[in-house]
């Protein structure tokens, strides 16, 4: 059993990108599903689907690569920020701009999981889960 499902998912995505896989399988949890929805909406992954096998389920994620250079993935860096031993919470005005706005910060708020820019526009803070660029 994995204690931190977000770190596990990010590591699986990172390893699949390094191995240039087209799809990767990650455990099915609500937080993983919500993070993947944000990544799909922002254009970092193609899509994902929920599959069930016996008692447990998993998410099958289709990775996205650049159209000009098929070897270069759309996801280059996935960095976990908040971890079980040290949670990182921010107010609205302290939400960081990742790489000057090139990347995204994924934040868990009272309104759900969203990007840092959307949370800033809504005027709500939350827990910084990870940075993506």
Swiss-Prot record:
Record's function text: One of the primary rRNA binding proteins, it binds directly to 16S rRNA central domain where it helps coordinate assembly of the platform of the 30S subunit.
Designated gene of the protein: rps8
InterPro entries xrefs: Ribosomal_uS8, Ribosomal_uS8_CS, Ribosomal_uS8_sf
NCBIfam families: PRK00136.1
One annotated Gene Ontology cellular component of this protein: ribonucleoprotein complex
Family in the record: Belongs to the universal ribosomal protein uS8 family.
Subunit description: Part of the 30S ribosomal subunit.
Record keywords: Chloroplast, Plastid, Ribonucleoprotein, Ribosomal protein, RNA-binding, rRNA-binding
Name used for this protein in its record: Small ribosomal subunit protein uS8c
A biological process term (GO) from this entry: translation
């Amino acid at each position: 059993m994995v204690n931190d499902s977000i770190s596990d998912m990010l590591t699986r995505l990172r390893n699949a990108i390094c191995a240039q896989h087209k799809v990767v399988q990650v455990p099915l949890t609500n937080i993983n599903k919500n993070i993947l929805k944000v990544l799909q909406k922002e254009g970092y992954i193609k899509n994902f689907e929920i599959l069930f096998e016996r008692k447990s389920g998993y998410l099958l994620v289709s990775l996205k690569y650049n159209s000009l250079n098929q070897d270069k993935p759309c996801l280059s860096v996935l960095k976990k920020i908040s971890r079980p031993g040290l949670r990182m919470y921010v107010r609205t005005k302290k939400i960081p701009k990742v790489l000057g706005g090139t990347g995204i910060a994924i934040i868990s708020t009272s309104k759900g999981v969203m990007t840092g820019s959307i949370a800033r526009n809504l005027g709500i803070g939350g827990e910084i889960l990870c940075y993506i660029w």
